[in-house]
A protein has these predicted regions:
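Nucleic-acid nuclease catalytic cores
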Residues: 78-109
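Short, solvent-exposed loop/turn segments at secondary-structure junctions
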Residues: 14, 41-43, 96-99
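Conserved catalytic cores of phosphodiester-cleaving nucleases, focusing on short active-site segments
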Residues: 25-27, 32-57, 77
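Non-catalytic C-terminal interaction segments of nucleic acid-processing enzymes
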Residues: 98-168
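A structural signal for short coil/turn segments at secondary-structure junctions
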Residues: 2, 29, 81-85
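A Trp-anchored, charged/polar loop motif used as the substrate-binding/catalytic surface
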Residues: 67-79
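A short acidic/basic microdomain associated with nuclease active sites
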Residues: 1-28
Length: 168
């Protein structure tokens, strides 16, 4: 489709702290750079692929961290956009776990990070209170602010999986 495209996996980019971040996939085409971050989260299931092979999927669980990590990818792509030569990037999630795209409306400490169908995320994102009314603290997963606003619009991949793509 794009034979002139250069594709690199796990490409390092400098970050604002003087270190490096690694981007899952980077496509370079006609002088433009398109960074892509991927998340693949599964719920335990046995599925049959297009060739008839049976595949056992593991349960990743920790939906709260999966949502956080997806939005943190968007944050990282926003920051990268400010320091690198690219006009747009993409955050992509593929999952068979409806906990990501269904809004249960059950109050939880990760309400600010939920990525259910129709949710809009932007600005300051932080953890809320636990069911005991205490501030949730997660080492290594702190608050952050998104510059843009992103609508979560899930799409059907097949009868098992759905995917989410946000352009940054």
């Amino acid at each position: 489709m794009f034979p002139a495209a250069q594709i690199r996996l796990e490409r390092p980019f400098p970050n604002n702290a003087g270190g490096r971040n690694y981007i899952d996939i980077v496509v370079e085409l006609n002088g433009e750079v398109f960074p892509i971050e991927l998340k693949y989260k599964t719920k335990k299931a046995t599925i049959t692929d297009f060739s008839g092979e049976s595949i056992s999927l593991q349960n990743h669980s920790a939906t709260d961290f999966g949502c956080y990590d997806y939005l943190k990818d968007i944050y990282r792509l926003e920051k990268l956009k400010n320091i690198a030569n690219h006009k747009r990037g993409f955050a992509i999630m593929l999952t068979n776990d409806p906990a990501y795209h269904n809004n249960t409306q059950r109050v939880s400490a990760y309400d600010g990070f939920k990525i259910y169908e129709g949710a809009t995320r932007g600005g300051l994102l932080n953890w809320g209170l636990t069911t005991k009314g205490l501030q949730f603290v997660c080492n290594g997963r702190g608050s952050f602010s998104l510059s843009g606003t992103y609508k979560m619009q899930w799409n059907t991949y097949n009868n098992t999986f759905r995917y989410l793509i946000n352009e940054i």
